[in-house]
Amino acid sequence: MEITFLGTSSGVPTRNRNVSSIALRLPQRAELWLFDCGEGTQHQFLRSEVKISQLTRIFITHLHGDHIFGLMGLLASSGLAGSGQGIEIYGPEGLGDYLEACCRFSSTHLGKRLKVHTVRENGLIYEDKDFQVHCGLLKHRIPAYGYRVEEKQRPGRFNVEQAEALGIPFGPIYGQLKQGKTVTLEDGRRIRGQDLCEPPEPGRKFVYCTDTVFCEEAIALAQEADLLVHEATFAHQDAQLAFDRLHSTSTMAAQVALLANVKQLIMTHFSPRYAPGNPLQLENLLAEAQAIFPNTRLARDFLTVEIPRRTADPAIAMSTPQASPA
């Protein structure tokens, strides 16, 4: 389970940063989920290791252009009208109308493989055997939703050696024991599966909050997350701009991380005003956040972040981008 940042700038792209988009890779099922799709996102796919062919779900936070202007181009290029798997999109009310209008005026036909789910309230919006996705209404100028992806806990490792020592015959019975069930052997012995399994492995939690000013819903959504990606459009000294435009500062993002007891915070969605050469730069925002929540990082385009299993090293590993800057 890992994420790749495809865009980390707010409002407009810069020479080194595209606008918002994050890809969540689920390697165990060769599947890719996308969060937001700013202008140029499909170009970022081409410059990265993530594959459009694995894309199955897109989660849109809100309908501002820097989060959706790349959506139509990406969908048109993804082969929805032909063979291959479909794509399901989740987002605020109006997203379906936007896509319909784009298709109508551009004479684009996406076929029947696209399904749009309108998000209208907090709560569970998707679930399968491995994952749950919840959304929460944030505080922005238009309806904006944060998303929480939660992996379900996995059964603990089955102790085959112990089972063999007990004389349990290999076969379908092992599958029942792995599920923690109690089985009765032919000789009358009752074996509890839970006695042959290690403790269940907790699932991982990834939370994405943007665009928003500091709010209680972000804290609730991010509770105990392994990784929180939170917008930090402004520096602390520009807090009035954040309140006026309902965006977050670096210190607001850090406060959410602290109050939600997350493991790691990665800030994104930076205003171009902090680009290199300006009096205040992103390193200053990082220092502000780390003073509140030390385990904070800055996102950059093409950065890939692995979210390790809870039984692994608790430190989240960060790999070096392999692609050239956008």
From Swiss-Prot:
Record: residues binding Zn(2+) 2: D66, H67, D211, H269
Cofactor(s) essential for the protein: Zn(2+)
Entry keyword annotation includes Zinc: yes
EC code: 3.1.26.11
Signal peptide, first to last residue: none
Record's keyword terms, sorted: Endonuclease, Hydrolase, Metal-binding, Nuclease, tRNA processing, Zinc
CC cofactor note: Binds 2 Zn(2+) ions.
NCBIfam families linked: PRK00055.1-3 (NF000801), RNase_Z (TIGR02651)
Quaternary context: Homodimer.
Protein's name in the database: Ribonuclease Z
Natural source organism: Synechocystis sp. (strain ATCC 27184 / PCC 6803 / Kazusa)
Gene: rnz
